[in-house]
Amino acid sequence: MSGDEQSIYMVYYKNMIIFLLLFIAHCLADYYLQRHSWIMDKVARHERSVGLLYHMLTHVLLTGATLFWLVGFNGSWFMLWIWILIIGTHYLIDIWKTYQTFTLPYYLADQIGHIVVLILATYLLINSHALPDSTYTFLLEHQAIIIWSAALVFLANPMAITIMVILMPLREKMHQKDTSIAVS
């Protein structure tokens, strides 16, 4: 691998590790720390929901902690703008989702929207040169832990919920057949 290829590879790799850290924070807040009662409150009250407020506070704390850990506070307000971008768009996407039915297309649109924002935030962070060299060194030294953590966090609860949403129409059809058999 030439020097240019290696440098392109390292930039890509750093981007992926930073994205994975933001993705872990997102998954923890969306799938592990969000209570069912908050979800039901969001569906019932939409943007006036206390559940939405609690959910957003969870994202504020986890995303903020992740960004602060990555960038630190070096006097730059750029991190604050990234934080506002992630939290603000998450809030808007979640409000939009409360007005939709809980079906696969809307579920996927919701999660893809969040992931696109995290990719954009990663891109902006990398190109801002706000991340200190010590952060890059740490990320590269602990890359395996970060990758495995992201895989475990994603494959446990988020994947189970995704499979449940995929299978919901089939389950409803099976339930309808069971009911029609019992009535006959």
Task: Label every model-predicted segment.
Residues 1-10, 27, 88:
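Low-complexity, intrinsically disordered short segments enriched for Gly/Pro and polybasic residues
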Residues 4-20, 63-81, 122-147:
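Helix-coil boundary and interhelical linker segments in multi-pass alpha-helical membrane proteins
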Residues 13-36:
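N-terminal signal-anchor module of multipass membrane proteins
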Residues 20, 25, 41-74, 183-184:
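Transmembrane helix-loop-helix hairpins at the membrane interface
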Residues 21, 25-26, 85-86, 121, ...:
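Alpha-helical transmembrane segments in multi-pass membrane proteins
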Residues 27-29, 85-95:
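Alpha-helical transmembrane segments and their membrane-interface exit regions
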Residues 31-56, 93-118, 140, 148-184:
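Interhelical loop and helix-boundary elements at the membrane-water interface
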